[in-house]
Curated annotation (Swiss-Prot):
Functional description taken from the UniProt entry: Transcription factor involved in the circadian clock and in the phytochrome regulation. Binds to the promoter regions of APRR1/TOC1 and TCP21/CHE to repress their transcription. Binds to the promoter regions of CAB2A and CAB2B to promote their transcription. Represses both LHY and itself. Recognizes the promoter of JMJ14 to regulates its expression during the night in a circadian manner. Binds to the promoter of BHLH80/FBH1 and regulates its expression in response to warm temperature, thus contributing to temperature compensation of the circadian clock.
Known outcome of mutating S432A: No effect on CKB3 binding, but loss of DNA binding
Induction info: Circadian-regulation with peak levels occurring around 1 hour after dawn. Up-regulated by APRR1/TOC1 and transiently by light treatment. Down-regulated by APRR5, APRR7 and APRR9. The CCA1 mRNA is relatively stable in the dark and in far-red light but has a short half-life in red and blue light. Modulated by BHLH80/FBH1 via direct negative promoter regulation in response to warm temperature (at 28 degrees Celsius).
Cellular component per GO, a single term: nucleus
Protein name: Protein CCA1
GO molecular function: cis-regulatory region sequence-specific DNA binding; DNA binding; DNA-binding transcription factor activity; sequence-specific DNA binding
Residue stretches making up the HTH myb-type domain: 19-73
Coiled-coil residue windows: none
Region called Disordered, residue ranges: 86-152, 188-225, 238-260, 362-483
InterPro entries from the UniProt entry: Homeodomain-like_sf (IPR009057), Myb_dom (IPR017930), Myb_dom_plants (IPR006447), SANT/Myb (IPR001005), SANT_dom (IPR017884)
Comment field (misc): CCA1 and LHY are only partially redundant, but they bind to the same region of the promoters.
Binding region for DNA: 46-69
Positions bearing Phosphoserine: S5, S6
Amino acid sequence: METNSSGEDLVIKTRKPYTITKQRERWTEEEHNRFIEALRLYGRAWQKIEEHVATKTAVQIRSHAQKFFSKVEKEAEAKGVAMGQALDIAIPPPRPKRKPNNPYPRKTGSGTILMSKTGVNDGKESLGSEKVSHPEMANEDRQQSKPEEKTLQEDNCSDCFTHQYLSAASSMNKSCIETSNASTFREFLPSREEGSQNNRVRKESNSDLNAKSLENGNEQGPQTYPMHIPVLVPLGSSITSSLSHPPSEPDSHPHTVAGDYQSFPNHIMSTLLQTPALYTAATFASSFWPPDSSGGSPVPGNSPPNLAAMAAATVAAASAWWAANGLLPLCAPLSSGGFTSHPPSTFGPSCDVEYTKASTLQHGSVQSREQEHSEASKARSSLDSEDVENKSKPVCHEQPSATPESDAKGSDGAGDRKQVDRSSCGSNTPSSSDDVEADASERQEDGTNGEVKETNEDTNKPQTSESNARRSRISSNITDPWKSVSDEGRIAFQALFSREVLPQSFTYREEHREEEQQQQEQRYPMALDLNFTAQLTPVDDQEEKRNTGFLGIGLDASKLMSRGRTGFKPYKRCSMEAKESRILNNNPIIHVEQKDPKRMRLETQAST
């Protein structure tokens, strides 16, 4: 090392290795002049500048431009000259550094994105740049596409949404929507005037429906659950435009109603594709929708207004079902044409008059919404009294091929058997099991449901409310899979119910039975009480004696009693153990049992 005259060591800066190996780009005068010409012609269109320079890549041109622009700006500041006047160059303005709405901008398609360019200051023509496809320019493209997409967000917003929507909807039906213009997305968003008119129609239908339910004498009170779920319906289509416009105004859409019915599956599919739960509800409700919605006067079955009204009513039915019963399970549409439609005079006296007036699409759809709404409300009100209403049902409902309603529950017959088991008391005769079921339901719902008695007085309920109760019972049973009982469990329950007291019912259980039963009913209103003592009819008494005779072969009576009354006690509560220890200390006869706590004790001895 060389030393200074002052004796200090000279600090020699060693170059870093990567700067030694890297060769700096050399720009000749010709290339620089061509670069400046291209700047004047094309601005920041780097691909066109690359074609004009012809010896450098776009990445190299951009880095050179950055250095060149900063150099020009420094010179202009130093000399006090306006930027660009010295070299007669209009430096393109930098990109606006806005924070994007979404931090990672998504590309709308796999094709090349046409980038738009901010114009040159001196008013020369601005040409759109294209995406660079060279592999060595990946870094430049990544830097370039981010600010380009930031500036394009406002312009191409509708294009992006249209493209994304079409890519989703084209899997259902590719011919349903035209992809040529970007204004199709606006048809799927309701304007404020149309939304207010739609809400007006819905409010009128709701008020009419409340008036009709009061006239009808159903002691249900006002409906508290929401009738209408907001559904994304294509408002550009004339199905909903005729709903939102009053019938006196001419329809703004040029299509006819017959054409609308033909395009109905496309609209419904594109609408229900957004929400899969609503799609499930719509398919379930449309499988039970009557094919001919003629009320009082006979209307020809193929007339387009009724068919279009049925189309709009399917969405109304789905939303009403969704609001009333929650999410529905997947059910296949019924092959048999069952579930005969009920006459609309059941729900209100003025329904027939309105059905005869249903010449336009608006009246038909409003009426169908009222009909489905009242049907869903009856399903809700009859849900509590479903077991009590079973007394007034004909016996033919138990046979699977007797009525169309039993076809409707045929696919889920096992679920219906799980809920109310006819053979739970050891007997299959309908008279005894009906009595046991009625007694059980009355005793179970005695303390909590005061409204059951009011509904029990009205035994002349229509067929539809009972079928709705059955359907809602089946659907709620399927949605709770832990309530399902297997066949082996059902056989075990039959054996347990044939005795008076279950093995698990301790004395502590009998003391606090009412409190726990109320808690259980509040928690799970549809659950089956397993610690429930069934009353034995004479037929069941004979059955139990016969079973006892079969079991008693080869056993003495004490063994039989000990086997019948003793069961597996999985865990004992602390209060139970305290009671047992007190009983054992007071009773010297059973004092030996303290040595072996795992031995089984008779319930009769423990209670003395």
